A protein has these predicted regions:
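M14 metallocarboxypeptidase catalytic domain recognition
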Residues: 1-185
């Protein structure tokens, strides 16, 4: 069982890189992934696994799609490689597939930190990371999330990505009228 932890968001709310009372922006999430990989090279590897719809179509505000692989990385191994032939089993957590699901990316952030901070501290975390690749994608839909982030007071209710190939809909997006493709259809 995981120990009970208390998290205080008082120092994080409405700070730089946040919106709507403390949710972190895409830029803040990507900076976090960069820092984890840079500060823990034997436990984490940042992977660019593709491009968002906007970036693929040369639209403004397009993003690289980023994942972080967390495991005890062995020298000269296939750990965290982008191929199916690896030695360790893999677990994949995808968060924020729908742009307006703000809390899922926050939970992914905390889980990444929990795994990194508790390696060689908690025996279960150590055993997990010694034997398994844990892949986390904290922001599956950055194009859609960027639309949500545009209104700091009350986030737009964009659910889909930012694909406009089917024509434009309501701007700002409402709960039922919005452009894009639902990524888990």
């Amino acid at each position: 069982t995981l120990p009970t932890q208390r998290f205080s968001r008082s120092d994080e709310t409405d700070g730089p890189g946040t919106f709507f009372g403390g949710y972190r922006t895409i830029a803040e999430h990507y900076s976090h992934l960069d820092a984890i990989a840079a500060n823990h090279p034997t436990l984490a590897k940042l992977v660019d696994y593709g491009d968002s719809w906007r970036k693929l179509n040369s639209k403004p505000n397009g993003y690289d799609l980023k994942a972080i692989c967390i495991t005890k990385i062995r020298p000269n191994s296939s750990d965290c490689a982008l191929n199916p032939n690896v030695d360790k089993p893999r677990f994949l957590l995808m968060a924020a597939i729908h742009a307006r699901e703000l809390s899922t990316s926050e939970m992914a952030w905390r889980w990444i930190d929990y795994l990194i901070d508790n390696y060689n501290v908690d025996t279960e975390v150590t055993m997990l990371l010694d034997s398994t690749e844990v892949w986390v994608i904290p922001m599956v839909n950055p194009d859609g999330r960027q639309i949500v982030e545009q209104n700091n007071i009350s986030p737009y209710l964009q659910r889909k990505n930012a694909n406009t190939s089917q024509g434009n809909c309501q701007n700002p997006p409402g709960i039922t009228y919005q452009h894009g493709v639902d990524l888990n259809r």
